[in-house]
Amino acid sequence: MPAAVPFPSPATSRRTLRGRPLARILQRESRFALFAAATLIAAFSPATYTRPVRQATAQAICFSAWQALPGYALLSVLAGAVLTHIVAVSAASYGLSHLALEAVVRVYVIELLPLVAALFVALRSGLDLLDRLAAERARGADFGTPMRFRQQVVPGVAGNLLAVIMLTLASGLLVLAVAYLVVYGVTPWGLADYTRLVGQVFDPVTAPTLLLKIFLFAVAVAVAPVAIVLDTPRRAASGSEMRVMARLLLLLVAIEGAVLMLLHF
């Protein structure tokens, strides 16, 4: 982890930026960006993972990703099967059955599943991590020390980041398989057409862009809750769930908008 994490100096900030709301917002967001960069460097650095940190990270991954995977995958598959059936029946009634599967893949797998997975992880394990860190910070815990930062912040970041990636990819693959079964049934005769369709949808531009979006969603969900450690103890004790979730939602919307512009313009 870098030697210095960009923690706030509230007294100085209030003196220098009083009466300048825009400057305060810019300073707060720049501090958040520096903190996010430092946190990601720590999370991807092998030197961070001492034995206690590895154990805490394994527990975080188990809670955030592994325990959530069966239920989330089941719900995604059921929703995908229902959506595929509705779209296929509706498209057939208009003579557009050849477009049904493509619509499901483009809308559900590429657009909806990554966003739903990000929100699911944020509400399930992100809020849990936020509450624990907020309670520690409210009691005056100093997360600027490397040991505390590595042991209490990095495991949650790694767990949430991997959870978003794992849930999105696993549910996406399962939905692709279920969509084929809903339209073609248990038969191999549609595999050639379906494989060609999936290859056309995930072209050399769409596939890496989708992976980039999933990764950015994962980073946003991983970093946003732990930014509570930047708050003063008094501010952390006042309740920060709405503020953190609002920032996370804005980040997800900004990422989605940037990806749509990259794909379609």
Segments predicted by a language model, with ranges:
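Short helix-terminus and kink motifs of transmembrane alpha helices
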Residues: 85, 89, 119-135, 222, ...
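Hydrophobic alpha-helical transmembrane segments of multi-pass membrane transport/permease proteins
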Residues: 68-89, 251-258
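Short cytoplasmic-facing helical segments at TM-TM junctions of multi-pass membrane proteins
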Residues: 131-157, 237
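Selective transmembrane-helix segments that form parts of the transport pathway or gating/packing helices
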Residues: 65, 69, 73, 149-174, ...
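Membrane-interfacial helix-loop-helix connectors in multipass membrane proteins
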Residues: 86-109, 170-215, 219, 223-243, ...
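Final/C-terminal transmembrane alpha-helix of multipass membrane proteins
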Residues: 237, 241-261
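Short, membrane-interfacial amphipathic segments enriched in basic
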Residues: 11-57
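Membrane-embedded or membrane-proximal helical elements that form or frame transporter/channel pores
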Residues: 73, 90-129
